[in-house]
Amino acid sequence: MSHTVKIYDTCIGCTQCVRACPTDVLEMVPWDGCKAAQIASSPRTEDCVGCKRCETACPTDFLSIRVYLGAETTRSMGLAY
């Protein structure tokens, strides 16, 4: 099941989300928009299990990474209307 993984430009390039992901959905890619000169990327969203460990690991005040669960997961969790 695929979930949407969004990475925002508030990413500081710390790699915490990449290390927290149990399914290797994330990787770091070069980016000049932050001091670390890298940003998280999500090239394998089809492997995302929706655990949101990446969100939990993010140290920025506004989460730089968000996982939006697919409709099937939301329904199975009783969150759908």
Curated annotation (Swiss-Prot):
Cofactor mode of binding and number, as noted: Binds 2 [4Fe-4S] clusters. Cluster 2 is most probably the spectroscopically characterized electron acceptor FA and cluster 1 is most probably FB.
Gene encoding the protein: psaC
Residue ranges constituting the 4Fe-4S ferredoxin-type domain according to the UniProt record: 2-31, 39-68
Membrane protein topology class: Peripheral membrane protein
Keyword Nuclease belongs to the record: no
UniProt binding sites for [4Fe-4S] cluster 1: 11, 14, 17, 58
EC numbers for this chain: 1.97.1.12
Quaternary structure and partners: The cyanobacterial PSI reaction center is composed of one copy each of PsaA,B,C,D,E,F,I,J,K,L,M and X, and forms trimeric complexes.
Protein name, entry field: Photosystem I iron-sulfur center
Catalysed reactions, as listed in the record: reduced [plastocyanin] + hnu + oxidized [2Fe-2S]-[ferredoxin] = oxidized [plastocyanin] + reduced [2Fe-2S]-[ferredoxin]
One annotated GO biological process: photosynthetic electron transport in photosystem I
InterPro entries: 4Fe4S_Fe-S-bd (IPR017896), 4Fe4S_Fe_S_CS (IPR017900), PSI_iron-sulfur_center (IPR050157), PSI_PsaC (IPR017491)
GO molecular function, one term: electron transfer activity
Protein role: Apoprotein for the two 4Fe-4S centers FA and FB of photosystem I (PSI); essential for photochemical activity. FB is the terminal electron acceptor of PSI, donating electrons to ferredoxin. The C-terminus interacts with PsaA/B/D and helps assemble the protein into the PSI complex. Required for binding of PsaD and PsaE to PSI. PSI is a plastocyanin/cytochrome c6-ferredoxin oxidoreductase, converting photonic excitation into a charge separation, which transfers an electron from the donor P700 chlorophyll pair to the spectroscopically characterized acceptors A0, A1, FX, FA and FB in turn.
Presence of keyword Oxidoreductase: yes
Main enzyme class: oxidoreductase
Chain positions recorded as [4Fe-4S] cluster 2 binding sites: 21, 48, 51, 54
